């Protein structure tokens, strides 16, 4: 007899890991996206130093989410990877370029400009690939008997290009609000100045995606328009977060723009989950269809319940130790 609905528990754990990754690695990817446009080389140093203590720890959540997905829902892996080989490769290549550039830039002198572009390019590529993968998930996958039967480039459509651009804009907004909170002087003023145009861009792209999505998938269209459900609360909350970003930037608040931007991402993410629930491989397979054996999920869950609190405590401790402003000339390398 199964005492717990383990696929549901695992779905919550993996979903939590994904949103933690989006929020925590999103802002340092955003810093990388904004890197070429910084007002000075000194500002770029400060931007890197603002994320230096936390950027590699932020990626822990990607590992946690990916490993959990493989262990708990192997069918998802067996369909997603063949469908998204190129997209996932671009994502990982971007993260690798970003990581290498991060370390080498602090050591380089004559070639620093090359690592500047590698850092920005890797961040941009990783962010775009993440958005395109999300768009491919919304589109759904062509499957037969639990196997992907589509082509290698079926994921790449105008819709996924748009979701990739949306993720770029969203991460750039996270990065600019992070810089407002963590820096001061000329760099902070620059971050204030670009945040509202970035917010406008995010709202425009997200609006187009929201209008387009019901035409991409019948399930989403039916769920959105068959009745006025809780899903319509989420766009309202998202717009309230956008208004709070606008208001707090106009009033020169420092922490609230970043908090409100995280709220914008959270409510958008919840909207995606509610629109697709309970399908993990749309449009055919639910999380119960794709789940591994109950015994496997239970064994792995016991280990994960030990690991997650450690990761949470370490993450909280890191952010507490490195709280406060990062000033020009100060760094952790």
Where are these regions (language model features)?
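N-terminal signal-anchor module of multipass membrane proteins
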Residues: 1-57, 63-65
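Helix-coil boundary and interhelical linker segments in multi-pass alpha-helical membrane proteins
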Residues: 1-14, 68-84, 138-158, 219
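Membrane-interface helix-loop-helix modules in multi-pass inner-membrane proteins
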Residues: 54-123, 144, 221-229
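Long, contiguous internal "core" modules enriched in hydrophobic/ aromatic residues
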Residues: 104-254, 271
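Short, membrane-exposed interhelical loops at transmembrane-helix boundaries
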Residues: 281-300
């Amino acid at each position: 007899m199964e005492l717990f609905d383990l696929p549901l528990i695992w779905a919550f754990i993996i979903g939590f890991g994904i949103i933690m990754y989006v929020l925590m690695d999103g802002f340092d990817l955003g810093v990388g996206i904004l890197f070429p446009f910084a007002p000075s080389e000194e500002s770029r140093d400060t931007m890197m130093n603002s994320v230096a203590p936390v950027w590699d720890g932020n990626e822990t959540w990607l590992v946690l989410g990916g490993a959990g997905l493989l262990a708990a829902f192997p069918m998802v892996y067996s369909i997603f990877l063949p469908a998204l080989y190129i997209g996932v490769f671009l994502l990982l290549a971007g993260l690798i370029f970003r990581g290498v550039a991060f370390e080498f830039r602090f050591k380089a002198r004559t070639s620093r400009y090359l690592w500047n572009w590698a850092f920005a390019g890797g961040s941009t590529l990783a962010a775009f690939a993440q958005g395109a993968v999300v768009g491919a998930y919304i589109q759904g996958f062509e499957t037969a008997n639990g196997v992907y039967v589509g082509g290698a480039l079926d994921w790449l459509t105008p819709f996924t290009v748009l979701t990739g651009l949306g993720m770029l804009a969203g991460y750039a907004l996270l990065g600019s609000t992070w810089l407002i909170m963590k820096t001061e002087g000329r760099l902070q003023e620059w971050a204030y100045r670009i945040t509202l145009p970035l917010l406008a861009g995010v709202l425009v792209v997200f609006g187009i995606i929201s209008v387009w999505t019901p035409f991409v998938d019948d399930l989403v269209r039916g769920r959105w328009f068959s009745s006025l459900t809780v899903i319509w609360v989420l766009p309202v909350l998202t717009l309230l977060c956008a208004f709070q970003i606008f208001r707090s930037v106009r009033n020169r608040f420092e922490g609230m723009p970043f908090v409100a931007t995280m709220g914008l991402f959270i409510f958008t993410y919840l909207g995606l989950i509610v629109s697709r629930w309970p399908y993990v491989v749309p449009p055919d397979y639910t999380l119960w269809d794709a789940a591994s054996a109950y015994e496997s999920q239970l064994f792995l869950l016991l280990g994960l319940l030990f690991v997650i609190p450690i990761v949470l405590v370490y993450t909280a401790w890191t952010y507490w130790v490195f709280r406060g402003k990062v000033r020009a000339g100060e760094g952790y390398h």
